[in-house]
Amino acid sequence: MAYVQEEWIPLTGLGRMVAAGEITSIDEVLASGRPIKEPQIVDLLLPDLEDEVLDINMVQRMTDSGRRVKFRTVVVVGNRNGYVGFGQGKDVQVGNAIQKAIVNAKLNLIKVSRGCGSWECGCETAHSIPIEVTGKAGSVKVTLKPAPQGIGLVTGDIPKKVLMLAGIKDVWAFNRGQTRTTINYAKATFEALKQTNMVRIGGTE
């Protein structure tokens, strides 16, 4: 989803380093340990990033002045090659809520370690994940297991969208909890992908 971009004036030290060309890759940004506070950092270093809206919900709240309605959106971003982000946004306008969610997803960007962790495969290419990982959000628990090449993404529609944007092609997924709650289903998948970086082994990318 494209939006009109204004000229970027960096407000953080990390942003100024990226704008000045002192940092030239998203890997350097993530390795620095500094939080990404400006989405333009991601726009500049990952120009091929895609986004997908996973859910739009209307949220109502009673106030002294009456009933207030906002839209809550859930968005995932990724470049289909090892980087993915998850975010949500709220606003009285759907378009603004989506844009806020996209910004938050970029600020929450992570690198996913990919590999061939299936004993049935052993091709040593980055088509799956290197290890079994689990993520939780609310009542939802998602476990991702390495799958051999050609199996595809054996999971529900929501995790499949997250995994595709992360660049994962083959995986087995097992779920528990209220998976009808899109926000928790997507976040649990994202949290599982975070865990791929906890163990560094050979044959990962």
From Swiss-Prot:
PROSITE patterns associated with the record: RIBOSOMAL_S5, S5_DSRBD
The free-text domain remark for this protein reads: The N-terminal domain interacts with the head of the 30S subunit; the C-terminal domain interacts with the body and contacts protein S4. The interaction surface between S4 and S5 is involved in control of translational fidelity.
Q: Which UniProt keywords apply?
A: Ribonucleoprotein, Ribosomal protein, RNA-binding, rRNA-binding
Q: Which residues form the S5 DRBM domain?
A: 49-112
* UniProt cross-references to Pfam families, sorted A to Z: Ribosomal_S5, Ribosomal_S5_C
Gene symbol of the encoding locus: rps5
One Gene Ontology term from the biological process aspect of the record: translation
> Which HAMAP family is this protein grouped with?
Ribosomal_uS5_A
Q: Which GO terms describe its molecular function?
A: rRNA binding; structural constituent of ribosome
Q: Is the Zinc-finger keyword given for this protein?
A: no
Q: What does this protein do?
A: With S4 and S12 plays an important role in translational accuracy.
Quaternary structure, from the entry: Part of the 30S ribosomal subunit. Contacts protein S4.
Protein known as? Small ribosomal subunit protein uS5
Q: Family membership, please give it.
A: Belongs to the universal ribosomal protein uS5 family.
Q: Cellular component per GO? A: cytosolic small ribosomal subunit
The keyword Ribonucleoprotein appears for this protein: yes
